[in-house]
Amino acid sequence: MHNSLAELIKPRTVEVVPHGSHSARVVIEPLERGFGHTLGNALRRVLLSAIPGAAVTDVVIDGVLHEYSTIEGVQEDVIDVLLNLKNLAIRLNGPHDVYLNVDKHGPGPVLAGDIEASHDVEVLNPELLIAHINGNGRLRMTLHVQKGRGYQPVANRAIEGDSAIGTLHLDASFSPIKKVSYVVESARVEQRTDLDRLVIELQTNGTVQPEEAVKHAANILNQHLAILVDLKGEDLPLFGEDGPQFDPLLLHPVDDLELTVRSANCLKAENIFYIGDLIQRSEADLLKTPNLGKKSLTEIKDVLATKGLSLGMRLENWPPEGLKKLNQ
């Protein structure tokens, strides 16, 4: 029997079953045979690499110049303290990175709940042990928390050259997803017994709920695949009759991003006038711009992310001929 595209089975139910702390099982069924692995693998990869989160990226500890030091009056050495800080589950509700302080006298433990957080910062695991203070010891440190995606080693992260002496840089795991796996089981609809049931098991650090993480991952996939729905449609306009194809958003001036005056002026000073110009610059390139620091860089990255763009992208045949006339 000939099967048309209209006869493909589509998922009818999505069941979210919470279990344990910040964990859930997501069941999607029914699916055509093979679609379980297709969707499961794609969702798993996106969940692990593309869900945004926050992490400690830099630490300054009073009396410490490098990570191989010890801290007077503190049981743990510096490396152990830094490793503990990597397990911090923190949510930033504002658009910018933040600096948080810890100032604790001994004796006793230093917990994540001892971090002095502002109203737009939430520590989701306040019971996390950071260090033990002996006797009359004291631990004072400043934590730099940034937003990001995936895992970023220090070597791959743009760092300002004027970092203060004693600043300790951490490899940052921004992903709020702690574990994710999937299995494909057999499903049945009426007389068909060759269908798939996709079961996704995931655990987050509490900064995002499992159901929201899956929705976000599905939305990311949808945005990337939507452009393929109609390759000849108006969603892929031509610049000129025979010219290269560009997303019209890239042809807009950077003023349309509504950046702060400081950030916008810094970009224009570097001859970055269009969004297409901007996305081709790397973080390291922008940090070399006079008067543009990490705060401005974070603002630019956040605004681009809301439009599905990022720094470091590459565009063939850019700029298109006649671009300057487009927005006059």
From Swiss-Prot:
Catalytic activity: RNA(n) + a ribonucleoside 5'-triphosphate = RNA(n+1) + diphosphate
Keyword vocabulary terms for this entry: DNA-directed RNA polymerase, Nucleotidyltransferase, Transcription, Transferase
Region (Alpha C-terminal domain (alpha-CTD)): 246-328
Sequence segments annotated as region (Alpha N-terminal domain (alpha-NTD)): 1-232
InterPro entries for the chain: DNA-dir_RNA_pol_insert, DNA-dir_RNA_pol_RpoA/D/Rpb3, DNA-dir_RpoA, RBP11-like, RNAP_asu_C, RNApol_insert_sf
Any single GO CC term annotated in Swiss-Prot or TrEMBL for this entry: DNA-directed RNA polymerase complex
Record text on subunit structure and interactions: Homodimer. The RNAP catalytic core consists of 2 alpha, 1 beta, 1 beta' and 1 omega subunit. When a sigma factor is associated with the core the holoenzyme is formed, which can initiate transcription.
Functional description taken from the UniProt entry: DNA-dependent RNA polymerase catalyzes the transcription of DNA into RNA using the four ribonucleoside triphosphates as substrates.
UniProt-recorded name of the protein: DNA-directed RNA polymerase subunit alpha
Species lineage: Bacteria, Pseudomonadati, Pseudomonadota, Gammaproteobacteria, Methylococcales
Gene name for this UniProt entry: rpoA
